[in-house]
Amino acid sequence: MDYKEEFKKINKKLVERYSKLDDSEEFWAYLYKPLRPSIRINTLKGNLKEIKALLEEKFELEPIPWTKGEGFYIKSYDVNYGQLIEYSLGLIIPQEASSMIPPVVLDPKPSEVILDMAAAPGSKTTQMAQYMENEGCIIANDAKRDRANILIANLTRAGVLIAKVTVKDGAYFARYENTFDRVLLDAPCSSVGMIRKNFKFARTWSIGKVYYHSRLQKRLILAAYKSLKPGGVLVYSTCTVDPLENEEVVDFLLQKTDAKLEKVKLPLKTSEPVIEWEGRKYSDEVRKTIRIHPQDNDTEAFYIAKIRKPR
């Protein structure tokens, strides 16, 4: 099958744009391919080894190498989480493998005060609470009330006790200058990575959405950085491939503030960050960020930047 041609039938402009970014056969083939099911074992609710043993009675598990031992692929495409007692009890959290990377990079510690600026549906929030051992505080924010309700349900099922859910425009948190030990901005985006979950993201993609999200992301990342304590860490992430929503947003922050990028070392394959796009030239510092295309690790596309505020 010619996967690029298949995508042209769905959205020709999407293909025209991202062929300039990665025109390999593998890029389009993996973007077409369904995602492998993946879960996190929730140690807030039980012992990792015991829960893993329960799951292995039903499925073959494969460790996800960039997690802290709690992430697994389920080697079966026929998984109905709603029918699993382990899901109902909050012992497992369904979560795409690459979306587990931002909390690993943020590395929150017990007793810290964390801002999750765009938290819903909450899988990353529960992951952070797990790393914090339910000690400290997470402000779990979302701009939309209906999404915040889903967030609350997921936090409750996971046994998260340290999250305070707010419904605010993320830029609101700029008023809390130098407040948070760490901030996660998993930003709203054009969701090209989500095409592997549902082709509607290919059908509904438009360049207008890219421009809209890029403007929003720049507003949010400035607020996120302002709210961060000196010495603190901000992780910026998206599940898309567009440089206007990734490298451009990080480059914008570097130009506007004293932010410093830190190189991330994890056991995963990555694609080269984009230094030049549509006549724009970005700082060489963005080479320290992580760009993941679908074929790199057979996951969603993702982008992650680790940012430090100097003391």
Swiss-Prot record:
The stretch of residues making up the signal peptide is: none
Out of the domains of life, which is the source? Archaea
Q: How is its activity regulated?
A: Substrate specificity and tendency to aggregate are influenced by archease.
Cellular component (GO) terms are: cytoplasm
Q: Where found? A: Cytoplasm
Catalytic activity, EC: 2.1.1.-
Citing just one GO molecular function, the answer is: tRNA binding
Chain residues that bind S-adenosyl-L-methionine: 118-124, 142, 169, 186
Q: Which PROSITE patterns match?
A: SAM_MT_RSMB_NOP (PS51686)
Query: Which residues are annotated as active site?
Result: 239 (nucleophile)
Family matches, as InterPro entries: Methyltr_RsmF_N, MeTrfase_RsmB-F_NOP2_cat, MeTrfase_RsmB-F_NOP2_dom, Nop2p, RCMT, SAM-dependent_MTases_sf, tRNA_Cytosine-C(5)-MTase
Which reactions are catalysed by this chain?
cytidine(49) in tRNA precursor + S-adenosyl-L-methionine = 5-methylcytidine(49) in tRNA precursor + S-adenosyl-L-homocysteine + H(+)
**Keywords assigned by UniProt, alphabetized:** Cytoplasm, Methyltransferase, RNA-binding, S-adenosyl-L-methionine, Transferase, tRNA processing, tRNA-binding
Q: Name one GO biological process term.
A: tRNA methylation
PANTHER family with a match to the protein in the record: 28S RRNA (CYTOSINE(4447)-C(5))-METHYLTRANSFERASE-RELATED, NOP2 YEAST -RELATED NOL1/NOP2/FMU SUN DOMAIN-CONTAINING
Entry similarity comment = Belongs to the class I-like SAM-binding methyltransferase superfamily. RsmB/NOP family.
Matching NCBIfam families: nop2p, tRNA_cyt_mtase
Q: What does the protein in this record do?
A: Catalyzes AdoMet-dependent formation of m5C in tRNA. In the presence of protein archease, specifically methylates the cytosine at position 49 (m5C49) of tRNA. In the absence of archease, catalyzes the formation of m5C at many locations in tRNAs or rRNAs.
Q: How does it assemble?
A: Forms a tripartite complex with archease and tRNA. Binds only the oligomeric forms of the archease.
Entry protein name: tRNA (cytosine(49)-C(5))-methyltransferase
Organism of derivation: Pyrococcus abyssi (strain GE5 / Orsay)
